[in-house]
């Protein structure tokens, strides 16, 4: 048996292609999922939609007790796990980080005591090996994108969502912090009336009480005729990425995932910062973001303010190939090979003699 540790719903799109590959090779797969007051609706929907064999827990302590009792051959994590060292000699542990974006946590998560980490591309492999020379890293690519590359992800039925299939489709997928949501015009969809707009925020923006102002704005925008707001239960970004012609986002993993599909991206350089991240405390913001944020800025067209956004979007829709060379260059470094076979490489390793 191989277990996937699901602390948050957004880990699942990274896990599912690997699950399918494991099941195709006759492996038993189980998902250890953490109950959550804020996220339970999304979790229940994902379990039902994907027919997952789930074991529910309330804490890391319960998850650890389950792993110690069941002794799976592997436990795959989407983030650090404080008790990973206690699984030594019981089962193997692997890390599949749930995003490929520029936040510093992409690297610091490897401080966790995992047996192996699957990584995306040679640049990040080398950098992680420099930071953690005694740990094992395997370059497999980014499994989350496999269904789109393979063509098995059909996308959304725009007409069924009340949108016009004849219009170009924009995907606005902001992260929760730092976010551009609060800096957008209150009625911005009306200024983009010639486009369909898919709103796919981070689920924190719709479920966490501390982000209720973001939720109010998103729900307001969802009332426009040319807009579809994904409910929190619709947790998988992939159908939205498959259906969109252009992505609008801030410094998020989604930005790099979309660019890896060779589609145009507009990067919002305007975002709302908490007081604790401004002025002389701006070092906190810099610590939250990785130097890769600036290294890879050329992957997208940039809008310095909301006022610039419409013109930048129009230009990228008219000339979608204008950043194609940079997208290809940076995708190779950030996502590695985008060939639809990342999950196969991960499973090859999990079932190999090298890993046993």
Language model feature labels by segment:
Residues 3-151:
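Active-site and donor-binding regions of nucleotide-sugar-utilizing enzymes
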Residues 5, 32, 96, 171-173, ...:
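Short hydrophobic segments within beta-strands
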